[in-house]
Structure formats: structure tokens, C-alpha cells
């Protein structure tokens, strides 16, 4: 039995312990825990205060309503296409501006959807150097689009980089050369982008299923499945891979310059009349070598002629295979794709043009001419389609002077492309001009930045042999038209 004094001592200790627990902060309560799972040492009020934006009163949204608060730390929700982030989940725009395929142009860091530029760079994508060492001429040259227009007439050039005109603040004009104008996608009546039924990319609307039109303004009265069924050709391809299906009807890619149907036609674009054109018969409006009729891409030959394209006379002592082989020579195409083969003999086209000659029409002196018609730059002579340059000149068209009065530094500054690479890494620099690699015949352009393989082909020939490839686009010779210079618009040859 304990004395009364001991009992009083126990009562005093119990009272003090009760008071202490009552006054203890809620951080010791098991309801709040830290990220490690240990009890949180913050009160609930303090934890929530740390998860609110500065200046927000108690009871307002925690973590901007984009996450949960755990012991004063915001755990942000995962969203599409990325995640909310930031100390208070305040950042949603996680993608920063890009320039030439690089985030913040490679000259800054992406912070909460905005570029923080390195010293010496500015702009929404850190694409503009604050100090420019380029001359105005070089700067403007670097700002020209493929049509040689500075910033597509939709912006201004700053040190070789385009700054697009977006005074309205909507940013609808963009692109490396300000070539994209999304204002073209806005419906004039509703003022909605693509009528609210599609997405805009570089000034073109891509409509949702069931809608069509330049601005997705027309609704299709049949289901997408039925539309696709009507457009499917017998070989199971939508519009035979030669057109676009719009509400159950095929719009074939080929357009005849006269306004009638073009070489590609049919309900599902299944007919390609180009299959009736022999590579050595491109210079006439007649199909099937002029000796038959073309029916949906197949030749029906007249009497006395045979072959896939009615190219072989029946009275020829040679077989069709022997005739074609004699006309090919070292080329993969009969008459090098520049003439007509009949019974093993080539007739070069166009008739009367002395620039195309040879037993198999292998020589084409038009290749020695520049776009202005000057032969070998005026500094050489043409021999079977190749320039033989005068002393002191070199290059494919004798366009480069061997003697140079520039310093190496001056020369290099003129050869650097927009990203600072010398001749795009595909050539060497001589006197301020890029000499593109001879091993890669398809590399061209002022800065060796063009790939001539991108030019359209027909019959296996770049620009159909009726023009030259200039930075990915065909520049057709007189009388020819079309993306691949495959359409003859001149007078018929006899």
C-alpha cells in the first residue's frame, strides 16, 4: 500500500501528461505521414499552407487542384500528353517552343513551358542571337524559303533567322521560314479553326471522320465505313493509292491541264494512262507509241504492231527483247529514256534538237546548261552532257573560279548554313561557295542542303528527263509541265 504522497505524485504526473498530449502538435498524430511513410512532423494547417500558392487563403485549392498534398509536398497528377509539374503543380504546358527541330533551339532550358535562354540568345525559342556577325546579304540569303522569298513575306529576317509577324499575339504564323499560316484554317462564318471539326497543321485542315472541305465545313451523309467501301478499288486499296477519298468519292491526284480528266482516272482512280506511255514516247500526245489505243492503262495495238506499249513492228527481224536490248546500250532504259526505239534503232527526241544525240541517245547537252540557258557557265564547253572547263575554272557547270582573294575565315563564313555547319556537312568550301560531294550526286543547293532524290520521278527518271532538279523541285524545260515535268504542253512533234 502506497503512502498518500505517492498517490498525489502519480495524479500530478498523469495530469501533466494529459495536458502535454492535448497541447502536442498534430504532426505527432498518425493521420499525417511523410513521403517516406514516417509520421509527418507538420501540423495539417502547416502542411496545407505549404501546398497552397502564395497569398491564397486557408481552404483554397491545394497543389492547384492538380495533385495531392502529402506533408507539405505536392504529388502532381499524371495527365495527357505529359505531367503537371513544379513545386505546386503549377506547370501544365510542359512543351517549350522549338526551332529547327530543337527545343529552345538548343540555346536554353525549358522551364514551365517557357524557354529560359542562355546568355547571348533571345526569342520565344531562344532562336535569335543578341549579337550578329553576319552581313545583311548573307543573313537574308539564309532566311529565304525554297522559292527564294525572304521569310515567305510573312516575317522579318534577324541574323539569318525569321521572326514571323504575329502582332495579334495568337502565333498563327510559324515555321523556320514563316511558311505556315494557320489563319488559313479559320472558318470565315464560325471563326472556328477547321470549323471545329478538324485540326490545323501548317495552314491545312485535317478533318475528323465524317467531315470534309477545305475548312471541314461539310458533313458527309454516309458513315466513314461506307465512304471507305465506296472508295476501295478492286485491289483493296483506297483510291488505288492514287487519290483521296472524300465522302465516298475519289479525288484522283492527277489533273489534266486542259481541264479534262488526267492520266489517272476512274471511280476509284484505278486507271493510270501513264502505263500506256513508253519512256521513249513521252514527246507525243499519242499513247501506246502511237500504234494503239489505251484503255485504263492497257494498250490495244493496231495491226502490224505488238508489245506491252505497241512499240514493236511485226515486220522487224528482231524480237521485241532483242530490239529493246540493242536500244538500251549501257542504260537501263531504251534510248536512255530520250528517244523512240524501233527495231533496235533509236530516234532521239525531241526531233531537230541537236543537243540530244548518240547511238542510244546517251548524250544530253541540255545538262550543261544552267536555268538561264548558259552553257557551262560561259567558262567551258559541253561534251556529251558534261562540261570541260577552261583553265582556272571548275565545277559541274564550270561555275567556280579556282583563284580566291578571300581569307579562309571570310570564305567559311559564307559557307555556313543556318545551324552553323559548313556546307551542311556534305561538301567543302571554296572561296565562299560550297562544292558539294561528288560521291553523292544527289546533293545540291547553295549550302549542299538539298537532296535531288526528293524530286518527283516518272518512268524511273528524275524530272522525267525533261528538266533539272533544283533543291527538291523540278525545273522543267520549255514545253513541259507537271511535278515531274511529265506533261507535254508544247506543239506535237511530227
Curated annotation (Swiss-Prot):
I-EGF domain residues? 40-90, 91-127, 132-179, 180-217, 220-270, 271-311, 316-362, 363-399, 404-449, 450-486
Give residue ranges of the II repeats.
Answer: 96-142
Q: Where are the V repeats?
A: 231-275
Q: Repeat X: residue ranges?
A: 455-494
Q: Where is the signal peptide?
A: 1-23
Record has Amino-acid biosynthesis as a keyword: no
| First and last residues of every IV repeat | 185-230
- SMART domains for the chain: EGF
Q: Where are the I repeats?
A: 51-95
Alphabetized InterPro entries for the sequence: EGF-like_dom, EGF_extracell, Integrin_bsu
Q: Which residues are glycosylated?
A: 405
Cystine bridges: which residues? 40-71, 51-69, 63-74, 76-89, 91-112, 96-110, 104-115, 117-126, 132-159, 143-157, 151-162, 164-178, 180-202, 185-200, 194-205, 207-216, 220-247, 231-245, 239-250, 252-269, 271-296, 276-294, 288-299, 301-310, 316-343, 327-341, 335-346, 348-361, 363-384, 368-382, 376-387, 389-398, 404-431, 415-429, 423-434, 436-448, 450-471, 455-469, 463-474, 476-485
Report one GO cellular component. Answer: extracellular region
Q: Which compartments does it reside in?
A: Secreted
Q: Where are the IX repeats?
A: 415-454
Q: Which UniProt keywords apply?
A: Disulfide bond, EGF-like domain, Glycoprotein, Repeat, Secreted, Signal
Ranges of the VII repeats in the UniProt entry: 327-367
In this chain the VIII repeats are located at: 368-414
Segments of this protein annotated with the region Cysteine-rich tandem repeats: 51-494
Intervals holding VI repeats: 276-326
Q: What domain notes does the record hold?
A: Contains ten tandem EGF-like repeats strikingly similar to those found in the cysteine rich 'stalk-like' structure of integrin beta-subunits.
Protein name in the entry: Integrin beta-like protein 1
What is the scientific name of the source organism? Mus musculus (Mouse)
Amino acid at each position: 500500500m502506497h503512502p498518500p504522497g505517492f498517490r498525489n505524485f502519480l495524479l500530478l504526473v498523469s495530469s501533466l501528461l494529459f495536458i502535454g498530449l492535448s497541447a502536442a502538435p498534430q504532426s505527432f498524430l498518425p493521420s499525417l505521414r511523410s513521403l517516406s511513410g514516417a509520421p509527418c512532423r507538420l501540423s495539417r494547417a502547416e502542411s496545407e499552407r505549404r501546398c497552397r500558392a502564395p497569398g491564397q487563403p486557408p481552404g483554397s485549392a491545394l497543389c492547384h487542384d492538380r495533385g495531392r498534398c502529402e506533408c507539405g509536398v505536392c504529388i502532381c497528377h499524371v495527365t495527357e500528353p505529359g505531367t503537371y509539374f513544379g513545386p505546386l503543380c503549377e506547370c501544365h504546358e510542359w512543351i517549350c517552343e522549338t526551332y529547327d527541330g530543337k527545343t529552345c533551339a538548343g540555346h536554353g532550358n525549358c522551364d514551365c513551358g517557357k524557354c529560359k535562354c542562355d546568355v547571348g540568345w533571345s526569342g520565344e525559342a531562344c532562336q535569335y542571337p543578341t549579337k550578329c556577325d553576319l552581313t545583311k546579304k548573307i543573313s537574308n540569303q539564309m532566311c529565304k524559303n525554297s522559292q527564294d522569298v525572304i521569310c515567305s513575306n510573312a516575317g522579318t529576317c534577324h541574323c539569318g533567322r525569321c521572326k514571323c509577324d504575329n502582332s495579334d499575339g495568337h502565333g498563327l504564323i510559324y515555321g523556320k521560314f514563316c511558311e505556315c499560316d494557320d489563319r488559313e484554317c479559320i472558318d470565315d462564318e464560325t471563326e472556328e479553326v477547321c470549323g471545329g471539326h478538324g485540326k490545323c497543321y501548317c495552314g491545312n485542315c485535317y478533318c475528323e471522320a465524317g467531315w470534309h472541305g477545305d475548312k471541314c465545313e461539310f458533313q458527309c451523309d454516309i458513315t466513314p465505313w461506307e465512304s471507305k467501301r465506296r472508295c476501295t478499288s478492286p485491289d483493296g486499296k483506297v483510291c488505288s493509292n492514287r487519290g483521296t477519298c472524300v465522302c465516298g468519292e475519289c479525288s484522283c491526284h492527277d489533273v489534266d491541264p486542259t481541264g479534262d480528266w488526267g492520266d489517272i482516272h476512274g471511280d476509284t482512280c484505278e486507271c493510270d494512262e501513264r502505263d500506256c506511255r513508253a519512256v521513249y514516247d513521252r514527246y507525243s500526245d499519242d499513247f501506246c507509241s502511237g500504234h494503239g489505243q489505251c484503255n485504263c492503262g492497257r494498250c490495244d495495238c493496231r495491226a502490224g504492231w505488238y508489245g506491252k506499249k505497241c512499240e514493236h513492228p511485226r515486220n522487224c527481224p528482231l524480237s521485241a527483247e532483242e530490239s529493246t536490248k540493242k536500244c538500251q546500250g549501257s542504260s537501263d532504259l531504251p534510248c536512255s529514256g530520250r528517244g523512240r526505239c524501233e527495231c533496235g534503232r533509236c530516234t532521239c527526241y525531241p526531233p531537230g534538237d541537236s543537243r540530244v544525240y548518240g547511238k542510244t541517245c546517251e548524250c544530253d547537252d541540255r545538262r550543261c546548261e544552267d536555268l538561264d540557258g548558259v552553257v557551262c557557265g560561259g567558262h567551258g564547253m559541253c561534251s556529251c552532257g558534261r562540261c570541260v572547263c577552261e583553265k582556272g575554272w571548275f565545277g559541274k557547270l564550270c561555275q567556280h573560279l579556282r583563284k580566291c582573294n578571300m581569307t579562309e575565315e571570310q570564305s567559311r563564313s559564307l559557307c555556313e548554313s543556318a545551324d552553323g555547319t559548313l556546307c551542311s556537312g556534305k561538301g567543302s568550301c571554296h572561296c565562299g561557295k560550297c562544292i558539294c560531294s561528288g560521291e553523292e550526286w544527289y546533293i545540291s543547293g547553295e549550302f549542299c542542303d538539298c537532296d535531288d532524290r526528293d524530286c518527283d520521278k516518272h518512268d524511273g527518271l528524275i524530272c522525267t528527263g525533261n528538266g533539272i532538279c533544283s533543291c527538291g523541285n523540278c525545273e522543267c524545260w520549255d514545253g513541259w509541265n507537271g511535278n515531274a515535268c511529265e506533261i507535254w504542253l508544247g506543239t506535237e512533234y511530227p
